[in-house]
């Protein structure tokens, strides 16, 4: 069953980057980078965390234009410690076409070096899980084109969640108690989340799921945003992050040489023996 919706985008001076499907903006053209940095990166204190945590996992509901990913990748590049990795798991139920993303990314001043690499590696739009490697495999983007509740089929725990699924009044499927419970299950002890919406039912739903939720100062037109965290029990880990999303394996590679070695490398990256 194909659960993907067809995204329709318009760009204008008054509406910014606008979703015709959800009748809501992705972001204001003039302030998009500052807003995303504040709501997601700064609120979750990622600069400090990247300097202190070896293997970091960010999960996101709403890949959208890829802006949050590029900003996180850029921040990690500037602040990560030696031999560390970034795993970025993002869900999207209405993917934007690569051509539209190219046009939108022209707005991302100062990020073109990463934007070009991402656009070159973006997959074609088909429902499923797409794994993309950057920085010699130290940054991994797992892009899941499916509905958000497909989260139930994956086994991982994130250090940080970005909840970026349009307004609850425009896209109710991104804001349900069932989904909040799944997010909580998929969050490490001591892990955090943030979102631009402060709707009462979102605050209550995340709180009922187990998060400590508070409203904090926003930016621009967003006067307040939400920040939450999961109580810290023991979040120390030395293991490299693993995302399990299939039961493939073991796999036998017949033949040596560059092709065989490359295949073994990528199977290992997908945790397939």
Q: Predicted segment positions?
A:
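Core SAM-dependent methyltransferase catalytic element
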Residues: 215-250
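Conserved beta-strand signature within the Rossmann-like core of class I S-adenosyl-L-methionine
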Residues: 190-197
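A short glycine-rich, Lys/Arg-flanked "PGG" loop and its adjoining helix->strand segment in the class I
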Residues: 176-189
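Glycine-rich Rossmann-fold phosphate-binding loop(s) that bind the pyrophosphate
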Residues: 61-64, 255-257
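N-terminal Rossmann-like FAD-binding beta1-loop-alpha1 element of flavoenzymes
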Residues: 246-273
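Rossmann-like AdoMet
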Residues: 1-56, 73-110
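Glycine-rich SAM-binding Motif I of class I
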Residues: 65-70, 261
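S-adenosyl-L-methionine
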Residues: 102-153
